[in-house]
Amino acid sequence: MRIKPLGDRVVIKRLEAEEKTKSGIVLPGSAKEKPQEAEIVAVGPGGLVDGKEVRMEVKVGDKVLFSKYSGTEVKLDGEEYTILRQNDILAIVE
């Protein structure tokens, strides 16, 4: 199944959190924070949003940092994704 976001929305797939601390301690699943780094898997067309022209600055495959509590989590074909607005993306990681 493909998902096509509308307007200035993007679909991201979170990158896995570290399983060990720098000192080598293994973290149980409940202790790991939600990762704030993700890969863009789909990008909306941009266009008029709230009466202003929005140009999409991210593309599929970009690695990004995003606001911790932003977006809507969805599950498709057993995979978890987050749909959020482009302005919830803080930076592109190069």
Swiss-Prot record:
Principal place of residence: cytoplasm
Example of a GO MF term: protein-folding chaperone binding
Keywords on record: Chaperone, Cytoplasm
Cytoplasm listed as a keyword: yes
Entry-linked Pfam families: Cpn10
Localization, UniProt: Cytoplasm
InterPro entries with a match to the protein in the record: Chaperonin_GroES, Chaperonin_GroES_sf, Chaprnonin_Cpn10_CS, GroES-like_sf
Record GO biological process: chaperone cofactor-dependent protein refolding
One GO CC term on file: cytoplasm
Protein task: Together with the chaperonin GroEL, plays an essential role in assisting protein folding. The GroEL-GroES system forms a nano-cage that allows encapsulation of the non-native substrate proteins and provides a physical environment optimized to promote and accelerate protein folding. GroES binds to the apical surface of the GroEL ring, thereby capping the opening of the GroEL channel.
Similarity-based family: Belongs to the GroES chaperonin family.
Assembly mode: Heptamer of 7 subunits arranged in a ring. Interacts with the chaperonin GroEL.
UniProt protein name: Co-chaperonin GroES
Species name: Clostridium novyi (strain NT)
Gene transcribed to yield this protein: groES
